[in-house]
Amino acid sequence: MLKKVIGLMSGTSMDGIDAAYLKTDGKRKVELGESITLPFNQNLRQKLTKVISSNFELKALERQLTEAHVDAITHLKNKMITVGDDIDLIGFHGHTILHDPNNKRTLQIGDGKLLAELIGVDVICDFRSNDVLHGGQGAPFAPLYHKVLAANLEKPLTILNLGGVANITWLGDSGKILAFDTGPGNALIDDFMSLRLGKKMDFGGNLAMSGKVDKKILENFLEHPYFSMSAPKSLDRNQFELSPVSKLSDADGVATLSAFTAEAVANSFKLVPKKPKILLVTGGGRHNLALMRELKNRLGVEVQPVENVGWKGDALEAQAFGYLAVRSLLGLSLSLPSTTGVDLPLSGGVLFRASSIKNDYK
């Protein structure tokens, strides 16, 4: 039986909240519905950026973030004319503020109990902690969903998610799968644009396309120990710094950072069993023409946005956590040895049932 689910994702790019409706059995059947993106207001974005604070402030921020997710659900349900209030489950990822799997720590803020109370629907959250506690990298978590979506596509196939951190899912014949973080995605570019020009991003990649890549700095970036590690592996958003490009012009700085993201993806192809013919790109970075150009130049394969195969790039991560919520409810695996490095296929997530929650927050 298919569950009616809303998946919620707040990514490391800090653009806003993605909300997506789907029906799924948590296995091989997925029927996709409406989706929306609700941008963060400036106040919330600034607080998430400066999240290292006292426990009181963190708790207040968690509530503000959760209430923003309630707004996203409301916007999505208003868009869904035929579904009404008939939702079985919500998959609530939350917002990652710490990811340190080597020390078995990962933290996504967002109050699943409060969300279940405010919406009146069962909520599954905290997807990553169990994987990290059992020795996994806790990321990436979308590959099992990618595998279902790509069931009828030619293999081998690679899906690249260009969020704040970039990660790939490699899909081979006979169900083979490999996934890992390749390096920075949009994070360094966005941080550079904010620091230098007060802008959220390099819109369309226009500034990068007017600049020149500093090859020496690019080479130094690629000497980071992360790139010599075997897969699966994962990164924290803030693992790389902007200091190497601090003396470059605005255009050259963002061009060099864009080349770094693309070259890190190119290097990741050395770790996959067989080079794919096509790279499907999802995440906000697919709108960056400079990044897409760099990927095509450095990879030597066809590079396409996921919309070319009928997927919604802005909704994919939210859909994934809706799908994973149903798998969690059924006790099915969310991560595999080949996706996070965990020893055995592992389930996870924490369930809050709306019917059992008292009005502690009123």
Residue map of PLM features:
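Short beta-strand-loop/turn "lid" adjacent to the catalytic site in phosphate-handling enzymes
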Residues: F56-G112
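Short glycine-rich phosphate-binding loop at a beta-alpha junction
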Residues: G84-G94, K274-G285
